[in-house]
Amino acid sequence: MALIDAIQRIPIRGVGISTDVEPDPVWVSDVLRPDYVELIYLQPKVVQAVADQFPGTPFEFHHADIEFYEPAGVTQRFVDAARTVIDILHPHWCNVEMGSMRVGSTLFDQFIFPFLDTDTLTLMADRLRQFQAAVPEVLVTFENPAPLWLCPGGMTLSDYMRQLADATQCGILLDLTHLYSLMQLQHATMNDFAAFPWEYVVQIHVAGSRAFDKILLDDHTAPIQSGVLALLAEVLPKCTNIRGVAYEMDFVSKPIARDMFPQVRRVVESVRPDLQPQAGSTLLFRPNL
């Protein structure tokens, strides 16, 4: 089908990182040696400076959240910001959050996700299609939301993600920490996600988290939970068209990053030794070392 064809046209990226400029990109390059870098949205002049410092580096792009709570939806400002960074990095995909960190002028420290029902599915599909049409040179991917409570709305996450991908022909960024937290909250096993659209997964994110009441909250400064790494080994064989696995490490300390990134790479290499960078990908390097 068209979506799978689009995913398969993307070169395999390998094992990379998703970050901004902290920790220092030079240290990341010299010490961690990721296969690719997914940059979180930064001011264009900062993105340009990073791109200039690392010529030949394969970059991907993690944009902001699509404001499904805001009547304006996908604004021209949102599109223009994405286009500017895409023109600098030349990524193959552009990820957006299926959630919101603001309602009006109120900001939250965690994403507020949509109800899993047909109304929000229709709204999210309209906004994803609108954004994909505005950036046709990349494949837009959307991320499974972080649960702050049991997902309301009547649909399962598996059905919601599959129907949204089918309706938009956009790929999926599978955030394993979000999935692991949902499984803990629902006392679920992988059998409960048999209908998940694994074949549409373009990239997997793994990240640190911290316990809060009965759930895990995203905390990229914390170590990765051992259960998340075990889940990575379990889901990788299911993601038959995956192009990359990235460790989300924005603002993590160097000792934690030095410990965690090799663990992620070891899991990937042991379970999916075929996930090696292909032609069209270039190993991260810094000139004049």
Regions found by a protein language model. Give the residues of each.
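Active-site-proximal loop/turn and secondary-structure-junction residues that shape catalytic pockets
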Residues: 21-23, 41-45, 65-67, 98-102, ...
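Acidic (Asp/Glu)-rich catalytic clusters
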Residues: 7-10, 27-32, 45-61, 77-92, ...
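Distinct, well-ordered alpha-helical segments
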Residues: 28, 51, 150-166, 182-195, ...
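Boundary/entry segment of secreted carbohydrate-active catalytic domains
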Residues: 1-35, 40-41
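Gly/Pro-rich active-site loop or hairpin
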Residues: 72-73, 110-121, 182-241
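Conserved, mostly hydrophobic/aromatic
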Residues: 37, 94, 140, 175, ...
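C-terminal helical cap(s) of enzyme catalytic domains, especially alpha/beta-barrels
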Residues: 254-288
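Active-site acidic/histidine proton-transfer and metal-coordination neighborhood
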Residues: 76-171, 181
